[in-house]
Structures are given as C-alpha cells and as structure tokens.
Regions:
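Catalytic cores of large soluble enzymes that bind and process phosphate-bearing ligands
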Residues: 19-26, 47-51, 75, 79, ...
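A glycine-rich helix N-cap at a beta->alpha junction
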Residues: 65-77
C-alpha cells in the first residue's frame, strides 16, 4: 500500500520568510525537533552557499553521531550543475533541484533566456551530476507547477526520471491552487510518469493544508507514495506554507481521509507543542490562539453548551486528544523571580548551576561552555532547555558550526 511521508522545508522555505531570521544553531534545532517528531526528511538549506557550509557539515556530523535518528537530510539547489558540484563534497545524500516551468516564469522571469527545451536540458544535467556525486535520491522541483500545463509537466517529469530523478515536486508557488484541481492533477501526473508527485503548497488562499492533503490523496490513487512539504507553524514566504502539525492531524483525524491512508513516518507527536513553542520563540512569531493543536484556544471552551458537553466528555467537542501533543515548553530561562542564567557573558559558575539544575550531564565542559556563549550570541536570546541539552550532549559536532573552534 502506498504511504504518505513528510519532507519538512522549514530550514529552506521557512527561513526565507521576510522579517524573520534564524541562526545556524537555530536551524540545527529545527532538525533535532523534526527527528524527535519522526519526520522522514528535512530540507536543511542551501549547501552551495558559503555561509551554509559549516552548518551542513555540523548536520552531517550530528547524523553520523545518531543525534538525528532516522531523519534524512537533503539540500536544495537550483537545477544548475555548478550548484550541485559545489554541494556534493559535503556528504548529503538527498537533493531537490529546482527550476521554473511555467510560461509565466519563462517569459517574465527568464525573459527568454531559457525555453522549455533548455529547462529540460538543465534539469537532466543537474540530476545526473547529483547522482554522479553520490546522491541516493534526487527530486526535481517544478517551480510554479500549478501554472504549468499538464503536457509540459509530464514531459518535464519523464525527462527528469530518465536522468535518474526519484520524485517531482509540484510547487504551488503563488498559492493559487484548489483541493479539487490539485488532487486531479496529482493523480494524472503520478499515473502518467510512474513517479511520486511531491506537494509544495503556499497558503495565499488559506488552503495550503487542504491542497497538500488533496495532492497526497491523488498520489495514493495513482498507486504512488506521497511526499508532503511542510513548515513548523505554517511559516514561509508571504502567507506561509502548509503547517506540519495541521497536515499530520488532518491525515490522522480527517473524516474520509484517516481510514484510507497510511503514514509511513514513525511520528511521535509528544514533541509537537515543544517544537511549536520553540519555533515561535526562535522566529519571534507568536503562535495564533486558534492554531490547530498548539494554539492557546485549541482546546478552550467557554460557551455554555460547549463547556457542558466538554466537561461530560471532551470528545463531544474535540476531534483529537490534546495529551497526544505533549507538554508546552517550560524553560529555565523563563523562570520568574530570582534566577541564574547562562549565556554570552556568563561565567563557569552560572553555566554549571544551570546545567546541574536541568540534570544535564556535560560531555565536554570547556567546549560546551564556549558553545553556550557562541550560540547565545548568534541567536540573540536566552537558550532554551532543549538547546542546552543538545550542546551538552554533542559539543564536538556543534563546534563545526563555528570554524576554528576545534583548532
């Protein structure tokens, strides 16, 4: 039976969000939380960019140290051979290679520099370069796929498949697709190409989650596995991307959906609230009160009829059990009243006090102490309990974020 998998793009599309910033250590924490949730794959960033190289090396080292569980790490590149060749020495085994496919983009972005034949040539060359460089899986991204006609999408996908591509990412780049349309297109494309068609949906019409679910169902109808792109808390360019938790909850609990799908990832939603709360803090974007599962009002009842029913049996007015989503963060740095913290300008006494208070065993005190200072300086905010625990457990791997620290 075909299965649904999640490929989270917080560390690529999410960090491109205007007016937000996330440090390389913050991006590392995203990968850690995705691993704890059991998500299949994280698109960790842009390995061909010079400032991403130390970060990518640190992620590969963490994966080698079993700090990221079964999480697969993938890099995003343009479908350009030079991007791929600059990336493959870093040791990533999974890639998505992106290029625009719609007439709108060919005419008004590329301005005639590339035509459809050139798009296919560039894509095939990039896929072959990735496979020659040791990639285990390669996906190709049809940017603006929702405005690309069916005929060229099939031609593009089959050409990529011939070159060795394993999946095609259908990008609803401007968020204009609708559930009925995208479901039908996915079923047709997956059937015609024999490839999984990966969802990448933006939320400009508020339908990113619905479109992602509909697209995935189209894959399943065609006998193909489905891959859904998500971001934590629905962060992303403009109005955001498909929210990770909302997609999971929809597939697990949606009427007419939950009984016909199988999720291939071994998900542990007990980390859902911790991840969401951390992301809101790290990105500086509060979680809306009505956010599914993690918003302050997601399980709140006030009106008489609802309150009475919920008190008798929460299932009267709640679709799923909040206990399955785990606790909200309760971090040391948020302690009110007298508290000793550790950070950029902290000393050894404060560092030891905080680590001891958290019950953390520090693998390398001197290196961990330096990392706390550096990570606090790069994030510009107090470090969370989970961040401190990661530093204490994997200082040598995290030191790769800061070239020269191990010299």
């Amino acid at each position: 039976m075909p299965r649904i998998h999640f490929l989270d793009v917080t560390n690529r599309d999410g960090v491109q969000t205007a007016r937000v910033n996330l440090s390389k250590f913050g991006k590392t924490m995203v990968n850690v939380y995705l691993a704890r949730l059991g998500v299949a794959q994280s698109e960790i960033g842009f390995p061909f960019l010079f400032h991403e190289v130390p970060y990518v090396r640190a992620q590969v080292a963490l994966a080698d140290a079993d700090a990221l569980g079964d999480l697969r790490l993938s890099g995003w590149c343009r479908a350009v051979v030079a991007d791929v060749e600059a990336s493959t020495p870093l040791g990533l085994k999974h890639y998505n290679l992106s290029i625009s496919t719609s007439d709108q983009m060919l005419q008004n972005k590329f301005k005639g520099r590339l035509d459809r034949a050139a798009i296919i040539r560039e894509t095939q060359a990039a896929v072959r370069a990735a496979k020659a460089g040791g990639a285990e899986t390669v996906g190709v991204n049809a940017e603006d796929g929702s405005r690309t006609d069916d005929g060229f999408l099939v031609e593009f996908a089959l050409a990529a498949k011939e070159a060795g591509a394993d999946r095609v990412r259908y990008c609803d780049t401007i968020g204009g697709d609708t559930p009925g349309r995208i479901g039908e297109r996915f079923a047709k494309l997956a059937s015609a190409t024999g490839l999984p068609i990966e969802t990448h949906c933006h939320n400009d019409l508020g339908m990113a989650v619905a479109n992602s679910v509909a697209g995935a169902l189209g894959d399943l109808d065609a006998g193909q596995d489905a891959w859904i792109n998500t971001c934590v808390n629905g962060i992303g360019e403009r109005s955001g991307n498909a929210d990770l938790l909302s997609c999971i909850l929809a597939l697990r609990n949606g009427f007419g959906v939950a009984d016909r799908v199988e999720i291939g990832d071994r998900l542990d939603l007990r980390w859902a609230r911790r991840f969401s709360g951390w992301a809101a803090y790290a990105f500086g974007q509060p979680v809306p009160n009505n956010q599914p599962g993690v918003g302050a009002n997601a399980f709140a009842h006030e009106s008489g009829i609802h309150a009475d029913g919920a008190l008798k049996d929460h299932r009267n007015y709640e679709l799923y059990d909040e206990d399955a989503l785990g606790p909200f963060p309760d971090d040391w740095h948020a302690t009110r009243g007298r508290v000793v913290l550790t950070g950029e300008y902290g000393g050894k006494a404060g560092f030891r006090h905080v680590m001891d208070s958290l019950g953390v065993e520090v693998a390398d005190e001197e290196l961990s102490f330096k990392l706390v200072q550096l990570c606090n300086a790069s994030t510009g905010r107090p470090l969370t309990d989970d961040e401190l625990r990661l530093i204490a457990a994997h200082p040598r791997e995290l030191a790769l974020l800061y070239p020269g620290l191990l010299a």
